[in-house]
């Protein structure tokens, strides 16, 4: 089938590559000529395991093409997917300008039936706005062209997006048209052949489902971080508590790991957008407000622990940071806890020696020329001569370090573990002072 995707960002690239790999004829349209040309050369602008090979294979097979020619894109696809950004406005609401611009573009050039699909994360009512924009544009042309608008939210995890798309746990389709349902079912049939994962619902419910899913996961994270802070004050160990509650099948173990808060392009933005939508609907979302505020404070937790440890201040201290991306297996630093910690440390007059196995280039882009910030070549170079080591992202290579070597490299043998990677008793045997999240009497409450 013929598919056009507007937007060659994270969602657009993964969606386009996976659909092409299933045999579809896919064109990705983007207004960024430089990015488009780099993609044609096989240069993928994001780090996502397996994506570069997938793009290369399908590009060489002629099933995946990148262009800036929107007219050609509209003429090409039966399915017109909108996968452009919906950045947060100052009030937390999702900015739909890019989405509606694409809708106008499609309406300006469409001459036959097509299905316009909103993949971008957008608030309830967005599909209605897209439909109205298409109607207005077609009316202005004096054209009568049939179309349908579908909400088809994505549920991709950065670092595991290819697997999520190829073997989805669900495919949500928001539509009220039986014909459209069958066409969407045919599009996703290669990915749901063994188990029918297609869930069809009305458009507004589909739009809310995406926000509800991310808000629920964010709530679990903030709740666990709140419990971790309580555990520190009452002398309990949150890791034992986690095992105790996770063994209950009604709770489970996913997303109940305490840490330095959630970041990335989705959870923070989507929680705030849902709060804004609730306000617009005349409802005060108290739980969501708490999720957001707890997360903002949790991003400062390692800094507060450092302040307590270094009673004479952080000015002039050198802090090693392990991990800059908001999670492992990505180079995404948007709203990452590391950025909050970096800003607080620099403001306090500290120097930073940072290392991330993938996000180094992104960190260089963000902090190039910033006094006091240095990127190290590897984890041990970052630790060399530092007054303390802070672990912010739980990359696999950080899980079993040489603690004896760390003790020798660090100016003062202190570790602030924001991801609870290590056994406190084992670390202490190497003569290292160890601070973690919610580990009871192991550290003063922050």
Region spans (language model):
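Structural/interface elements that position substrates and couple domains in central-metabolism enzymes
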Residues: 1-446
